[in-house]
Amino acid sequence: MALLSFLFNTKPKTANAAKERLQIIIARERNGRTGPDFLPALHKELIAVISKYVKVNPDDIKISLNSQGNLEVLDVNVVLPEDELVKP
């Protein structure tokens, strides 16, 4: 009988239980945040990358992070000037 119990163990695996607990902890931490830390750095990097190709005013790049149900949506709006391409 011990062999059958070992082969057909019905107890939940500890790895699965740990995974579920970790997912709960991560979900709670995400809900508790007031705002993402990475947005200022992302904004600076986007300005640098876009400026390589187009002369753009840094104030014309807007970034926002919105929650829609279980999803987080990152919106990036760039106002591009007409005929102001930078030659690489």
From Swiss-Prot:
InterPro entries: MinE, MinE_sf
Keyword field contains ATP-binding: no
Signal peptide coordinates: none
Highest taxon above the source species: Bacteria
GO biological process, one term: regulation of division septum assembly
Record keywords: Cell cycle, Cell division
Entry keyword Acetylation: no
Protein role: Prevents the cell division inhibition by proteins MinC and MinD at internal division sites while permitting inhibition at polar sites. This ensures cell division at the proper site by restricting the formation of a division septum at the midpoint of the long axis of the cell.
Family, similarity comment: Belongs to the MinE family.
Protein name: Cell division topological specificity factor
